[in-house]
Amino acid sequence: IVVTNPPEKESTQLYVTQKDEFTMSQKENFVILVLDCFDSREFTELLSEHPEYRETFADFTYFENMTAAYSCTKRSIPFILGGDWYENQGSFTEYMNGVYSGSPLFTALKERGYLIDLYEDELYTWDENALSDFDNIIIANYYVNSWIRLAKQELKLVGFRYAPFDLKRFCVTKKSGFDEEILVDCGYKGFNSENYYFKGDLEDNEIVMDDTQKRFKFIHLVGAHTPFIYDSDCNIIDIKDGTYKQNAEASITLAAMYIDALKKSGAYDDTAL
C-alpha cells in the first residue's frame, strides 16, 4: 500500500437533491418516470400474465413496438432529454453540457413557465452554468465521514480487478458504500435512484400540492437493471434468488405506487405522466 498526501479537492460540488420530489403543482405537472432496462417485450408478457396491470395503466398509451435509441443508459438518457445523437465529436462532457443547456424540451418548458427538476444519479458534467436551470440541483459543501472507511471501499474497488480470483468475492462494492462516507451540508437529502429508496420515500412521504408555478420532473430509477435483487413487491432478496422478471415486476410495483400516490394527492388529473 502506498501512502500519499491527502487529495486536493474542492469542498463544494453540484449535488442532486430530493428537493420537492413529491411536491406537485396545483396547476399543471409533467413527469417522466424512467424505469431503467425495462424491455417492452417483458412488459407485453407481464400484461398477459397479470390482467390487473391493465387496470393500473388504464389511462396510458402503450407502444409495443418502441425501441430505444441506444443499448446503454449513459447514451439513452441524454437522447431522451435532448434528442441529439452523440457522434464522438468532442468530449462526452461537452455533449452533456449542450444537452442540459440547449435541449428543446427544457427550452419549451422554461418558455411555458415550468419549474424544472432533474432526479438523476449521473450528471456526467460539473458545469454549474449548464445545470443552473434545475431547481433541485444545488451547490453543496462535501465532507468525508471517515477516511479509513472510504479507503477500504477504494481498496475493495481496486481489488475486484487485481486481487486473485478466489479473493474477488470479498471485493464487491456498491455505490451506496461510498455514498455513506460522503456527508453533504445543504439541508436536503440526496437523490438515490435505487428502487428500494424510492419505494421507502413513497411510503414515508405523501405527495403534496402547492400553488407555485407548473412543475416538470424527470425521475430516473434503476428499474429492471442488474443486479436482480428484488421480488415482485420490490422487497430486497438474495441475489441468488433474483431474476430479471422479478425486477421488472418490482418496477411495475413502483410505478403503480407512484400513480396511486398521485391519485390520493389530487394531482393525478393535472399531471402528464
Name the predicted role of every residue range.
Residues 31, 52, 250-273:
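Metal-dependent active-site segment of extracytoplasmic phospho-/sulfohydrolases and closely related
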Residues 23-24, 207-210, 261-268:
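Surface-exposed acidic, glycine-flexible loop patches that form ligand/cofactor-binding
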Residues 231-251:
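A solvent-exposed, charged loop/short amphipathic helix patch at secondary-structure junctions
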Residues 11-30:
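Short extracytoplasmic/periplasmic juxtamembrane "stem" segments immediately C-terminal to an N-terminal membrane anchor
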Residues 28, 37-235:
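Active-site-proximal alpha/beta segments of enzymes that process anionic O-linked groups
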Residues 1-9:
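Transmembrane and membrane-interface helices of multi-pass
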